[in-house]
Amino acid sequence: MPVITLPDGSQRHYDHPVSPMDVALDIGPGLAKATIAGRVNGELVDASDLIENDATLSIITAKDEEGLEIIRHSCAHLLGHAIKQLWPHTKMAIGPVVDNGFYYDVDLDRTLTQEDVEALEKRMHELAEKNYDVIKKKVSWHEARETFVKRGESYKVSILDENIAHDDKPGLYHHEEYVDMCRGPHVPNMRFCHHFKLMKTAGAYWRGDSNNKMLQRIYGTAWADKKALNAYLQRLEEAAKRDHRKIGKQLDLYHMQEEAPGMVFWHNDGWTIFRELEVFVRSKLKEYQYQEVKGPFMMDRVLWEKTGHWDNYKDAMFTTSSENREYCIKPMNCPGHVQIFNQGLKSYRDLPLRMAEFGSCHRNEPSGALHGLMRVRGFTQDDAHIFCTEEQIRDEVNACIRMVYDMYSTFGFEKIVVKLSTRPDKRIGSDEMWDRAEADLAVALEENNIPFEYQLGEGAFYGPKIEFTLYDCLDRAWQCGTVQLDFSLPSRLSASYVGEDNERKVPVMIHRAILGSMERFIGILTEEFAGFFPTWLAPVQVVVMNITDSQSEYVNELTQKLQNAGIRVKADLRNEKIGFKIREHTLRRVPYMLVCGDKEVEAGKVAVRTRRGKDLGSLDVNDVIEKLQQEIRSRSLQQLEE
């Protein structure tokens, strides 16, 4: 009979099989009331599942990450319960958990309206408030199939026929009259599923195949308590205000259009931000001793066959042909950089060779995945490749890591999660080579006092990598930086150098990106700053305004002086009230507004206001210029007097 070992090491002995709920009741009624599921010998199980042999057991509650995931999964079943009550002929497909919530794909003979979604959510609340028990039954494959055939659930039957072995025992979860099929676990009672909201609907093909029927996907979010739900909804509201697509339109930064899906039309102000970002990156390339190069936009398909991209990546590549030759528009820059490396004989004395490019790349992303600047088809990478010896890997990775943190800190990103991906089962190279490479990456991170977690087996077949994920002010994750070792591509493209022993050797290649896609990073910055770009990045840094026509000449002189000082400035001499002008330029997020009235003209000064509404008073013109230059030169995140 089972001996149950709890997380604190204590043991409980039973003379009969017990469930996690039985053990929780044995410990105390409070824990039993909070029990959602159990973890038995490391495996998640339902609270009602029986433990027949000695085992370790952890009780899962809503405070656990797994508990919240189970709540979300059960809310998907609750959605199924509600939709079948409102529209009984609906056919249910799949209802998994996703980030922050869940969805259910349904086959319904009507297009769901916003009113339908509201009615569905209302019915879900009515059902959840009944606090009914969720009953799990393990049945034979044949019984499960018969159940869903009788209910007309053709998608469930398809899952059984194609995805579940005939000797398996599927779990059927009974929500009163509604039955769903799942591996589980699920909540034991619907009292855990009170805090949810349906978010949106979308189209989705059955099994993700465009040859299949288009279903309706209903998305929802669910949380353990009302406070967490409200906090999430507030974050979404704030994110909507910061949406780079909305701000990009307000500030006239860029646009996209149907004739060029996933391609950016940069307007003057957006392109100003892009170019300033390039200037910043170039300053770091110089500091960290990189060469800057430029490769062609397209190369013969034969080259992409040599690299392996054609076999593994051709669906994402745009192609064209000329004079009976097929060309690929480059989806990445590395093969071109190897071609540059291959020009001329290289010696070990030439290494490390650090090669950087603002590489214009194109990838044939699915149209449904395109999203403003965040997911595009045409983009520019702040890409670099370092050619080095095995002995130089650690020092080069060390420098890459310092560069990553140096650049991210300029934008105020402080929370950065780092992951080290190790060797997969299918790989090239010896175990000794992988041992050394993984150790070099780990030691480089440790030497920089950077905590990291391993992603075992998640490296590429050609080498391990470090991924840097930054978190923005809304605590959203953005995977931007990568340091990837590559033991394959240089060999495939016949790259070599002459070693100290006068023998030809293949260099190690380090792929290094920090911002990732320039377009995407500008999207991230737009949302991070809500369009209030730091002064050094702002398209227009200063607007000079008159109050009446008598100050026009002074405004023009001051504007010219600011331009000569390297400041991006505009004069606003319109015959409008000064309050109107200030409001308009505040909405345009211009960092500084300089107001010139008769007093300022007489004293040779200027009244300074910030876009946050702070009045800095009447200041000497030369002092203002000097302070602005210092703020811009230092790439400060703060404005004057902050």
Swiss-Prot record:
PANTHER family linked to this entry: THREONINE--TRNA LIGASE, CHLOROPLASTIC_MITOCHONDRIAL 2 (PTHR11451:SF44), THREONINE-TRNA LIGASE (PTHR11451)
Quaternary organization: Homodimer.
Domain TGS: residue ranges: 1-61
Disulfide bonds, paired cysteine numbers: none
Binding site for Zn(2+): 334, 385, 511
Catalytic activity field: tRNA(Thr) + L-threonine + ATP = L-threonyl-tRNA(Thr) + AMP + diphosphate + H(+)
Name of the protein in question: Threonine--tRNA ligase
Membership in a protein family: Belongs to the class-II aminoacyl-tRNA synthetase family.
Entry's localization field: Cytoplasm
GO molecular function: ATP binding; metal ion binding; threonine-tRNA ligase activity; tRNA binding
HAMAP family: Thr_tRNA_synth
Region (Catalytic): 243-534
Any one Gene Ontology BP term: threonyl-tRNA aminoacylation
The entry's keywords: Aminoacyl-tRNA synthetase, ATP-binding, Cytoplasm, Ligase, Metal-binding, Nucleotide-binding, Protein biosynthesis, RNA-binding, tRNA-binding, Zinc
A GO CC term assigned to this protein in UniProt: cytosol
Predominant cellular place of this UniProt entry's protein: cytoplasm
Enzyme class name: ligase
Cofactor: Zn(2+)
Cofactor descriptive note: Binds 1 zinc ion per subunit.
Annotated SMART domains: tRNA_SAD
Reported function: Catalyzes the attachment of threonine to tRNA(Thr) in a two-step reaction: L-threonine is first activated by ATP to form Thr-AMP and then transferred to the acceptor end of tRNA(Thr). Also edits incorrectly charged L-seryl-tRNA(Thr).
Organism encoding this protein: Salmonella schwarzengrund (strain CVM19633)
InterPro entries per UniProt: aa-tRNA-synt_IIb, aa-tRNA-synth_II, aa-tRNA-synth_II/BPL/LPL, Anticodon-bd, Anticodon-bd_dom_sf, Beta-grasp_dom_sf, TGS, TGS-like
Annotated EC: 6.1.1.3
